[in-house]
Amino acid sequence: MTISVGCRAPTVNEIINGVVTNALIQGDDTLRYSDPNLKPQAPGEIAPDAIANIKKSLQEALLSDEFLSEWLGRFVTDPYSDVDLKAYAETVAPGKVAATVKKAVALVRTEGSRFAFTRGKKGAIAFYVNGQREDLAGKAALLAQELANRMVVPAEIVQPYMSDKKCQGLVASLLSAGALVIEE
């Protein structure tokens, strides 16, 4: 059994609406349906081949793994509308993050903030925070996974990553956005 904490569980109608809306926004208006290989048929008949061609076009446009993972990552991490994340924001310069984390007990995801990730190639990930995507690799990808998998991340788990500039930048941006807070 899987228990989901903090992410949205969409209805099928929300999924269809979201995917189609996203496809319309990102779609190419210049592409047209064509069926040059259509076999002769009765003038009023919609042939099974035509239906199969439309189905194939829809599958290519809407059901690619890349398209769906992008939409789902943004959808499930869309922040709660009744929470003001900026109220939690603490501006910390990337160069000072390591010292801040060293004094901390934990990094805590703020109420209403949502994190998720999808795996890419060679250890890279797409990291989704509050509806926004950031592509990460290396240590930053590993740190992002730790942050996505826990609501409260003990500082001793984060500290080894703080020698990496990209990790410092990641934590600084999450603190500045109000997505994380430092527990001292």
Residue ranges and their predicted role:
Residues 5-7, 129, 162, 184:
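Active-site proximal loops enriched in glycine and acidic residues that flank catalytic Cys/His/Asp
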Residues 9, 13, 140, 167-168:
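Alpha-helix initiation and N-capping motif
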